[in-house]
Amino acid sequence: YMISGMGSVFFGDYYGRNDVLFPVVSYSNNGADCLIAARKDDNNFALLLRNHYANGTVYTLTIPDDYADFYKYPVEALTTIRQYLMSSLGVYIEGVDNVGIFMYDNETFIVESFLDNDTIIKLHVAGGAKKLIDVRSGQELTPLLRKESESIFEVPLKPVFYKVFKLV
């Protein structure tokens, strides 16, 4: 997998766990930015395309023939997909597959692990959030990194467990 594109968290070549079968998308090289491509020998196959159209942006995500094959993508590719497709929501996950996020409109969201093992993810929150509060435990998380444009929080997750967070 090759990741490129201005603003992406990652840049370079990465390797997935297994081969993935997906349809080939035909697109005009001049009209689209290829943000993620699968590579095989000298061939590139677009997985995430970005087109600027009028006053907006259109993203095209190539879906594997078997939806579960998304889990075979490298962490870097999954994170880049989450980054671009969730940017308007204000929060996205950097981390492994099988972790979901459920957004609510009151500055609250749920992060759930569907894994069989412990994991640690990073939550990228737009703006300068000062802390996250774990609603169930009352624990306050402070950011690992805080910039004007985003704050990054490290969140440990237990297997098949969820956490509810409130932005402060």
Regions found by a protein language model. Name each.
Residues Y1-V168:
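A conserved amphipathic helix/loop scaffold
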